[in-house]
Amino acid sequence: MGGLKLPPQTLHGIHGGRRPLTAPSSKPSFTIQPNYSSSISTGFTTRNVALFSPSIFPCGYFILGGARERRFGARNTQASVQPVTEELVEDKTKENPVSGDAIRRRFLEFYASRSHKVLPSASLVPDDPTVLLTIAGMLQFKPIFLGKAPRQVPRATTAQKCIRTNDVENVGRTTRHHTFFEMLGNFSFGDYFKKEAIKWAWELSTKEFGLPADRLWVSVYEDDDEAFEIWHDEVGVPVERIKRMGEEDNFWTSGATGPCGPCSELYYDFHPERGYKNTDLGDDSRFIEFYNLVFMQYNKMDDGSLEPLKQKNIDTGLGLERLARILQKVPNNYETDLIYPIIEKAAELANISYALADDRTKMNLKIIGDHLRAIVYLISDGVLPSNIGRGYVVRRLIRRAVRTGRLLGVKGGGEDGVFLPAIAEKVIELSPHIDPDVKARGHSILDELQREELRFVQTLERGEKLLDQMLAEALLNAQKSETLPCLSGKDVFLLYDTFGFPVEITTEVAEEQGVKIDMDGFEVEMENQRRQSQAAHNVVKLAVENGGDLAENVHDTEFLGYDTLSARAVVESLLLNGKSVIQVSEGSEVEVLLNKTPFYAESGGQIGDHGFLYVTQDQSKQTAVVEIKDVQKSLGSVFVHKGTIREGVLEVGREVEAAVDAKLRQRAKVHHTATHLLQSALKKVIGQETSQAGSLVAFDRLRFDFNFHRPLHDSELEEIENLINGWIGDGTLLQTKVMSLTDAKEAGAIAMFGEKYGEQVRVVEVPGVSMELCGGTHVSNTSEIRAFKIISEQGIASGIRRIEAVAGEAFIEYINARDSQMKLLCSTLKVKAEEVTTRVDNLLEELRTVRNEVSALRAKAAVYKASMIASKAFSVGTSKTIRVLVESMDDFDADALKSAAEYLMDTLQDPAAIILGSCPDEGKVSLVAAFTPGVVDIGIQAGKFIGPIAKLCGGGGGGRPNFAQAGGRKPENLTNALEKARTDLILILTEKAN
């Protein structure tokens, strides 16, 4: 799907990028009903009104009037289609009828009673390589909308978890922007269309949820007369409250070509008293869009013309947080019961009253509440903090939450001051109706947050040191150029983006030292980042240029590879440089799509098969050969065979013989089954709580990442190897079954943390040893693995360890390579294999002796150099009794400088102050400060004095009052640094001596 528009301000990403407006300061009024109970049920606990709108009622309680309670009473509607899970729509007779949970449940019940299948939310990690994260409810149905996959049901309804970070800077500033939100949706796949979608949306809004009809406005595409007439003639919306809007706002497209159509949006009017004149639906102070209906009815052609689709679809999205805001009558989404308990927890940890806080403090609390929701659900879906891809999204959100909390003074209960886990506990507490798996994964989520926050605090401390260096350089440069000192926008952005430094803190620290901030330059860097983020989140498209045409002709690939390594298949499509072609000739790199294949496509950690495609004529003459070097999945289950035409010509429609390289497949099978055995062994040796965090199943090795807090001991690694080799020797037959996900979990099958599974799953079992959900290829008997060897164990991230190992043929190759290396080592050292360790130890001892001798010679040379420069010492103070020496010592290292300084202290005698600097290696600076007792006694310390000098050289350091060492990475600044040291010593010593 090429180039889907996803402007940040819309529920469904389909109307134009309107400029966000500041939330109104006025607050809606409430009617206090004295004859009713003074509390409301939220579905979790009975809470004070501050849960819903603390900014309105810092004290007291709020309840709904009787009439409104009756209007929002639970319906006894029977769904005609059974839901997937009871948790999605189970009746909650005691819940507040307008709680977030009740709204979600009632939405799903409403459409279930209209023959929609209630489907669970998809993972935040989409099954689509062209999209970073799940950003809309329609994403899990994208292959169906594109005609790439058959529909399983004609109608569906979901409550989809979504993540959007392309507008993260607006979070907390506006009333409605979020990184995590829920999109309630109803979908039709060639079943009902515009009339039903519009009427049901209106019925849901006005009858099910009781929204006043006179407060609802509608937007339609300017040329969509059909939608206009349905809204006006059949629903009864006055013409004055129906706005025709242009293509940018109300026409959804999937790219240059492909499925598209007009859309219609429902808006709630907070201020109907303003009338109809000059009304702008983009005015956030008055309106909020809460429901969006997309009518997919056209196919956009290459020439821009629109042709009617054979199958017309409905794709809708209703923002749960937005509707909750309306129904709960609070001034913004954050003060609904979906988010406010999290904000309340953050305020408690900061010892702040949200109700009495200023706007800036409230904004920061909203940021924390919003980001913690996104962080918890992302980690639950298997997205762990890292520096790339989805992991970087999580890491940035965590860092933004931490630095925002530090601004507010939020502190956890422990000695380390970590606070995110405490707030995340509240998110987990609220999670059962959003994602029931979150609570089960709570311990792992909290552990990951704890580790990441601690790591970031250390990063912040490094950032503080870097800021000090930047300010020192800015002051030095200003002194040279005789200009005002200024910190560049790039430096400020580096501190903000990499080290998590809020601009406010950078500005405050800089101003204390008389340094200004280049805010214009910083905004340029921020805008560049926004554009990159927007580009990353606006991509919901096929990976090929003419994806619309491809979608019409190619369907899911039938995988035959569990049962055979060769099969006859038909070429359905050829891609050359991303473009669909009819024919490809010899020498070309090509992507081949077949109707069926024995080739395994990369997934579940296992790499794709290698092999060949053969085209023959008359069952004998070979006319084309394609070497396949990789197989990937696209659009769900379309297998893309990537390779090179070695001979002949390949054409669309041609029948081919697809043959997998059997030897390489066997290597992959061996390593995949060995990976399952490794996970079982790890759980036995280090504990059942460890879990898989990633894997690679390759032809030459396997890699297994797992959650654990420390390196494994040699004895543990040996025990793991022995267990696995024992299971291999047992010669156990593997069992493979297909069953429901529920049955698999009840049977004890291990599911990959964060992996997305369908209703039916494949279970691979080594009886008595291992049972996992897995779609990969495996050996039939553990004896096929032959042998297993761990070749490395290391940490790759905080709390994540990695084991690399070999098995089968790769094990034999590894042992042979080790044997060859040992023979070469024995030959070089001229010893037997059993004598290598002793010989190496002897050589290392000899090396240490030689190094000590060299160091002693350098120290002597440094002392000699010191004796030559001692005469350059000069006296300061009124009595001229304090001797000062500041000199460069060429290329002596830190140890040699220390020897020289000690010699000079004895030679110059007390009182004396000595500063020495050198450049021992390219790109390095060494500094030493040595002060005799007489200098220390008058109030100057070497450890404190050397720090600012080292910063001028791009480094730092410190030490005792009488002796300190430092280093740096900017040798070109050494002369200026020593000059500053000389000047400062003269000023300080003269002042203190007098």
UniProtKB/Swiss-Prot annotation:
Positions of the UniProt region annotated as Disordered: 1-29
Q: Which domain of life is it from?
A: Eukaryota
Write down the InterPro entries for this protein, in alphabetical order. aa-tRNA-synth_II/BPL/LPL (IPR045864), Ala-tRNA-lgiase_IIc (IPR002318), Ala-tRNA-ligase_IIc_anticod-bd (IPR018162), Ala-tRNA-synth_IIc_core (IPR018165), Ala-tRNA-synth_IIc_N (IPR018164), Ala-tRNA_ligase (IPR050058), Ala_tRNA_ligase_euk/bac (IPR023033), Ala_tRNA_synth_plant (IPR027522)
Q: Where in the cell is it found?
A: Plastid, Chloroplast; Mitochondrion
From the UniProt record, which GO molecular function terms apply? Answer: alanine-tRNA ligase activity; aminoacyl-tRNA deacylase activity; ATP binding; tRNA binding; zinc ion binding
Give the chief site where it resides: plastid
What does this protein need as cofactor? Zn(2+)
Q: What does the cofactor section's free text say about binding?
A: Binds 1 zinc ion per subunit.
Give the EC number(s) under which this enzyme is classified. 6.1.1.7
Q: Which reaction does it catalyse?
A: tRNA(Ala) + L-alanine + ATP = L-alanyl-tRNA(Ala) + AMP + diphosphate
Q: Name one GO cellular component term.
A: chloroplast
Could you tell me the Gene Ontology terms of the biological process aspect for this record?
Answer: alanyl-tRNA aminoacylation
Q: Which of this chain's residues are annotated to bind Zn(2+)?
A: 672, 676, 774, 778
Assembly and interaction partners: Monomer.
The entry's family comment says: Belongs to the class-II aminoacyl-tRNA synthetase family.
UniProt remark on domains: Consists of three domains; the N-terminal catalytic domain, the editing domain and the C-terminal C-Ala domain. The editing domain removes incorrectly charged amino acids, while the C-Ala domain, along with tRNA(Ala), serves as a bridge to cooperatively bring together the editing and aminoacylation centers thus stimulating deacylation of misacylated tRNAs.
Q: Which PANTHER family match?
A: ALANINE--TRNA LIGASE, CYTOPLASMIC, ALANYL-TRNA SYNTHETASE
Q: What is this protein called?
A: Alanine--tRNA ligase, chloroplastic/mitochondrial
From the broadest rank down, the organism's phylogenetic lineage runs: Eukaryota, Viridiplantae, Streptophyta, Embryophyta, Tracheophyta
